[in-house]
């Protein structure tokens, strides 16, 4: 459950380390984002010589949340932290070429097959 001002870790090699959600996209007064939702983020911490720099405003898709996601069989998949993958503002394709950590199958429904194929583990 991600809302404005939430800090997230970045699960790709785009060069960002920590980002902050500044807007939940999809609806005029939408408050929360879950796994598979697109958010607007700003880079708060980045490594030198990365593809993005501190202060950049980009889109990202949420791939892991502490709140987790409920499956139709009643099971819940939760993670230790909140993480996202940074997207290109125009094409909504990932900026990074590698994904770190597991992602959930729910991304498959949300047109993020590129992230699924790059991820080391799909739960």
Curated annotation (Swiss-Prot):
Kindly give the SUPFAM superfamilies that the UniProt entry links to this protein. Answer: Ribosomal protein L14
Kindly list the GO molecular function terms attached to this UniProt entry: large ribosomal subunit rRNA binding; structural constituent of ribosome
Pfam assignment, any one: Ribosomal_L14
Known InterPro entries for this protein?
A: Ribosomal_uL14 (IPR000218), Ribosomal_uL14_bac-type (IPR005745), Ribosomal_uL14_CS (IPR019972), Ribosomal_uL14_sf (IPR036853)
Q: Which GO terms describe its biological process?
A: translation
Keyword set for this entry?
Ribonucleoprotein, Ribosomal protein, RNA-binding, rRNA-binding
Q: Which domain of life is it from?
A: Bacteria
- Name the CDD domains on file: Ribosomal_uL14
For this record, the Gene Ontology CC terms, alphabetical, are: cytosolic large ribosomal subunit
NCBIfam families xref list: rplN_bact
Protein family: Belongs to the universal ribosomal protein uL14 family.
HAMAP family reported for this sequence: Ribosomal_uL14
The protein's job, in short, is:
Binds to 23S rRNA. Forms part of two intersubunit bridges in the 70S ribosome.
Per UniProt, subunit arrangement is: Part of the 50S ribosomal subunit. Forms a cluster with proteins L3 and L19. In the 70S ribosome, L14 and L19 interact and together make contacts with the 16S rRNA in bridges B5 and B8.
Name of the molecule in the record: Large ribosomal subunit protein uL14
